[in-house]
């Protein structure tokens, strides 16, 4: 008999709690405070009301998961880590047949040169509502190992689903991120938000209205059909009306201004060069070092 990951984790939680009650200890630990809180109640039905903030950021930087790091990477180390972070995520979603696309600042970076901004330290993607349900049912809290060219031992990435994703309202302001893809070697992560039908706007006759819990609203025609492209030398999907979406979020100047955050965009090399250091960015278009999955995937979306 097959048992879903969510139900198995709930069972393990109960088992650990029961065993702990049988063994008296002078140093009792509150189980929920142990943040290998990888064992949580994923009963499959979801909680009855929104909980407290689920995803926690580190005390030293809000784009790091403090369970896996105690300090940020250097400016030199960050770009290659982010590059493999998005490649492994996109590779995994493609292997699963799961619909995903880049959004927000990551989409803007794609617009310029299909590379992560050299000053950036986060990545934003979106997924469809059927995809978040599938990932929660079959792949929540799963680890995915990849061989990384030039790196002994490779890296392991964690897919973690926020159980509060079942609450589809923007009122759940503490849980606007629905899932994360986390680099367990550095603590860097990808924020994953699910795009859902906007029930309130649809009641008012806007039949194609979509929304995310983070407050962003869209029309179906803004996103679908998705376009094929490349990002960090890897196949990626982008929203259909990407120019419209970027202008609405960042203004039209974001698509033309070649000076930003102490960097200048070199029209010849298509690279953001550091202005203060008066030297070209190390982010050259070089040989592609793509990751290779070593963890098998049992279930896929049809």
Feature locations, PLM:
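Helical scaffold of the NTase/Pol beta-like nucleotidyltransferase catalytic core
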Residues: 21-103
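The substrate-binding groove and active-site-proximal loops of carbohydrate-active enzymes
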Residues: 70-81, 117-124, 235
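Conserved catalytic core of two-metal-ion nucleotidyltransferases
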Residues: 82-86, 90, 94, 142-210, ...
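Short, surface-exposed, low-complexity cationic segments
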Residues: 243-255
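Structural recognition of the beta-strand scaffold that forms the well-ordered cores
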Residues: 100-103, 124-128, 191, 237
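Short, solvent-exposed turn/loop segments enriched in Gly/Ser/Thr/Pro and often Arg
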Residues: 103-111
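Catalytic metal-binding acidic patch
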Residues: 114-135, 233
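Fungal secretory targeting signals
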Residues: 1-25
């Amino acid at each position: 008999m097959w048992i879903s990951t969510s139900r198995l984790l709930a069972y393990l939680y109960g088992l650990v709690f029961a065993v702990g009650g049988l063994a008296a200890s002078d140093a009792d630990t509150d189980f929920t405070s142990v943040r290998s809180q990888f064992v949580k109640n994923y009963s499959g039905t979801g909680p009855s009301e929104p909980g407290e903030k689920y995803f926690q950021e580190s005390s030293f930087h809000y784009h790091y998961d403090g369970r896996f790091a105690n300090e940020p990477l250097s400016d030199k180390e960050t770009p290659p880590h982010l590059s493999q972070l998005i490649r492994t995520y996109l590779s995994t979603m493609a292997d699963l047949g799961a619909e995903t696309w880049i959004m927000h600042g990551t989409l803007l970076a794609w617009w310029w040169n299909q590379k992560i901004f050299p000053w950036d330290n986060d990545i934003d993607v979106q997924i469809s509502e059927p995809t978040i349900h599938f990932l929660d049912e079959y792949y929540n809290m799963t680890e995915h190992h990849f061989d990384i060219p030039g790196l002994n031992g490779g890296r392991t990435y964690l897919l973690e689903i926020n159980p509060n994703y079942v609450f589809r309202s923007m009122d759940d302001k503490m849980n606007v991120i629905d899932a994360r893809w986390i680099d367990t070697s550095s603590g860097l992560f990808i924020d994953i938000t699910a795009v859902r039908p906007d029930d309130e706007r649809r009641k008012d006759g806007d039949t194609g209205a979509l929304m995310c819990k983070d407050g962003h609203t869209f029309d179906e025609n803004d996103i679908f059909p998705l376009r094929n492209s490349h990002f960090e030398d890897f196949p990626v999907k982008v929203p259909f009306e990407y120019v419209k979406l970027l202008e609405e979020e960042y203004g039209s100047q974001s698509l033309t201004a070649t000076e930003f955050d102490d960097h200048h965009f070199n029209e010849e090399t298509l690279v953001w060069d550091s202005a203060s250091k008066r030297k070209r960015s190390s982010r050259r278009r070089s040989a592609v070092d793509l990751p290779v999955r070593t963890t098998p995937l049992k279930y896929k979306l049809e």
